[in-house]
């Protein structure tokens, strides 16, 4: 086998390979002999047809299979000899001047290689580490949210006020003409939640059941309804019902409704505190991991094999379609999503994959069995029967790959934080939970 390597670019390579036809022909004859033992050819009993007849019927397909295998085998040997790290899949092309009389089959393989990566120093690199203290106030806020989720409304005979639920009829006109979406009957909404435009809500506040009035409302220029954006409408509003919000008391009934079977309010608070702290820890870990990953990318600029980026784009596109399908959309009728929509995300994921692999290898980072077990137990704790979840994970080594990879990422984060300059930043509970 003859091999010639050519560098086409920073990461692109081409191997020109010549395979001896004697090896290919020998393998073809060996395969045909095997096929002949069971070949069914008209006029002959199975396995009794002459080899020439078998070759006439099956020779082309057998030769094609053998040639494909020999090309792949020859490429693998050449790559090993040249000590190349192939990224993605090669593109094979037969040589234009192939001549059987020359006794060889020539082809080329064009491909990309992994970039040489020398990890950048983390000394002096700054990482912003978010921290969040969970106090009684945060627990109280969470309990308040749970109470509001169980709000009931009692009808009242007074003017509508903030937090009241009102049921109204309304009909809007612009320049005296009705417009699409501008009217409704028996429409319920809660004042103060921002469901309606501020001028509309302000007009309803102070109205009583049975009262009607006209309210002028200006639609913002960037309003989602383009037909009315930037225009002024007059709404005739009739209030049909006013009801005030009644929050449940924090008592045994409330605790039971949230799964505390004996109604012990102190147990409820302890359970909520545990869940809040777990969620805070999860969000902090995700936020800090993202900060660490950005530091690694900034410290290790590298050219990416585009074959790997395209593979990741395909994976992300497939994942996006699956997500849409799970939401009930008919993805078959949708046009293909543009690749550029995923390019930046794909490039980031490929870069991080290369950097993390090198970092783990260079620093011999591992996920210990104890860490993996702790992660599985943490996940299982949120289920009704944790022991069954733990058993399920440990029934198959493949199932442990997920928690193992996440633990390894956590170890990378801890390693980077131990090497870089860490600046702690206090983050409020509301900001972390997305309520700010």
Curated annotation (Swiss-Prot):
One GO CC term, this protein: cytoplasm
Keywords: Cell cycle, Cell division, Chaperone, Cytoplasm, Isomerase, Rotamase
Catalytic reactions on record: [protein]-peptidylproline (omega=180) = [protein]-peptidylproline (omega=0)
Domain PPIase FKBP-type: 163-248
EC number: 5.2.1.8
InterPro entries to which the protein is assigned, alphabetical: PPIase_dom_sf, PPIase_FKBP_dom, Trig_fac, Trigger_fac_C, Trigger_fac_C_sf, Trigger_fac_ribosome-bd_bac, Trigger_fac_ribosome-bd_sf, Trigger_fact/SurA_dom_sf
Matches recorded under Gene3D superfamilies: 3.10.50.40, Trigger factor ribosome-binding domain, Trigger factor, C-terminal domain
SUPFAM superfamilies: FKBP-like, Triger factor/SurA peptide-binding domain-like, Trigger factor ribosome-binding domain
Localisation per UniProt entry: Cytoplasm
Keyword Isomerase set for record: yes
GO molecular function, one term: protein folding chaperone
Pfam families: FKBP_C, Trigger_C, Trigger_N
Membrane-spanning parts: none
GO biological process: 'de novo' cotranslational protein folding; cell division; chaperone-mediated protein folding; protein transport; protein unfolding
Keyword Cell cycle on entry: yes
Database matches in PROSITE patterns: FKBP_PPIASE
HAMAP family assigned: Trigger_factor_Tig
Function noted in UniProt: Involved in protein export. Acts as a chaperone by maintaining the newly synthesized protein in an open conformation. Functions as a peptidyl-prolyl cis-trans isomerase.
Domains (record comment): Consists of 3 domains; the N-terminus binds the ribosome, the middle domain has PPIase activity, while the C-terminus has intrinsic chaperone activity on its own.
PANTHER family: TRIGGER FACTOR CHAPERONE AND PEPTIDYL-PROLYL CIS/TRANS ISOMERASE, TRIGGER FACTOR-LIKE PROTEIN TIG, CHLOROPLASTIC
Protein family membership: Belongs to the FKBP-type PPIase family. Tig subfamily.
Cited NCBIfam families: tig
Protein name: Trigger factor
Organism: Laribacter hongkongensis (strain HLHK9)
Biological classification of the source: Bacteria, Pseudomonadati, Pseudomonadota, Betaproteobacteria, Neisseriales
């Amino acid at each position: 086998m003859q091999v010639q390597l050519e560098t086409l670019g920073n990461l692109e390579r081409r191997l020109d390979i010549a395979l001896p036809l004697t090896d290919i022909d020998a393998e073809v004859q060996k395969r045909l002999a095997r096929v002949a033992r069971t070949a069914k050819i008209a006029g002959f009993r199975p396995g009794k047809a002459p080899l020439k007849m078998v070759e006439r019927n099956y020779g082309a397909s057998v030769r094609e299979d053998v040639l494909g295998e020999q090309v792949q085998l020859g490429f693998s040997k050449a790559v090993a000899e040249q000590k190349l790290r192939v990224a993605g899949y090669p593109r094979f092309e037969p040589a234009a001047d192939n001549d059987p009389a020359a006794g060889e089959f020539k082809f080329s393989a064009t491909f990309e290689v992994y970039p040489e990566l020398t990890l950048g120093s983390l000394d002096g690199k700054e990482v912003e580490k978010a921290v969040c203290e969970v106090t009684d106030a945060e627990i109280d806020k969470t309990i308040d949210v749970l109470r509001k989720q169980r709000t009931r409304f009692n009808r009242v005979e007074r003017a509508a006020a903030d937090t009241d639920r009102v049921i109204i009829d309304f009909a809007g006109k612009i320049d005296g003409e009705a417009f699409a979406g501008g009217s409704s009957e028996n429409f319920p909404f809660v004042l103060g939640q921002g469901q309606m435009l501020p001028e509309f809500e302000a007009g309803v506040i102070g109205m009583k059941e049975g009262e009607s009035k006209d309210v002028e409302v200006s639609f913002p220029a960037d309003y989602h309804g383009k037909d009315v954006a930037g225009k002024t409408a007059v709404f005739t509003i009739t209030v049909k019902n006013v009801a005030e919000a009644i929050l449940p008391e924090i008592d045994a009934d409330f605790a039971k409704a949230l799964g505390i079977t004996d109604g012990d309010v102190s147990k409820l608070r302890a359970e909520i505190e545990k869940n809040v702290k777990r969620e805070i820890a999860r969000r902090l870990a995700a936020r800090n991991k993202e900060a660490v990953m950005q530091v690694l990318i900034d410290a290790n600029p590298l050219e990416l094999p585009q074959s790997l980026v395209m593979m990741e784009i395909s994976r992300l596109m497939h994942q996006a379609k699956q997500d849409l399908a799970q939401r009930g959309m008919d993805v078959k009728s949708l046009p293909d999503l543009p690749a550029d929509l995923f390019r930046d995300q794909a490039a980031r994921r490929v870069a991080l994959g290369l950097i993390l692999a090198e970092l783990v290898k260079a620093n011999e980072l591992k996920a210990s069995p104890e860490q993996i077990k702790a992660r599985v137990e943490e996940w299982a704790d949120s289920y009704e029967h944790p022991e069954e979840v733990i058993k399920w994970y440990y029934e198959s080594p493949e199932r442990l790959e997920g928690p193992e990879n996440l633990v390894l990422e956590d170890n990378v984060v801890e390693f980077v934080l131990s090497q870089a300059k860490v600046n702690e930043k206090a983050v409020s509970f509301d900001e972390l939970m997305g309520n700010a």
